[in-house]
UniProtKB/Swiss-Prot annotation:
Pfam families: Conotoxin (PF02950). InterPro entries: Conotoxin, Contryphan_CS. The cysteine framework is C-C. Disulfide bonds join 56-62. It comes from Conus virgo (Virgin cone). Keywords: Amidation, D-amino acid, Disulfide bond, Hydroxylation, Ion channel impairing toxin, Neurotoxin, Secreted, Signal, Toxin. This is Contryphan-Vi. Residues 24-54 form a propeptide.
Length: 63
């Protein structure tokens, strides 16, 4: 049983090494991405966005 465990661990290390070496080298999209402005209306726009996303029950506020 001990030899089987060692064999599985060695296989896992070899596979992970192969994946790292053969990777395409691109950076993940979120590492250097520019943050999107979800609230272009400033603080009041942010408040309205929160109300809209939460299903605002008070329609004069939600528009």
């Amino acid at each position: 049983m001990g030899k089987l465990t060692i064999l599985v661990l060695v296989a896992a290390v070899l596979l992970s090494t192969q994946v790292m070496v053969q990777g395409d080298g691109d950076q993940p999209a979120d590492r250097n991405a520019v943050r999107r402005d979800d609230n272009p209306g400033g603080l009041s726009g942010k408040f309205m966005n929160v109300l809209r996303r939460s299903g605002c029950p008070w329609h004069p506020w939600c528009g």
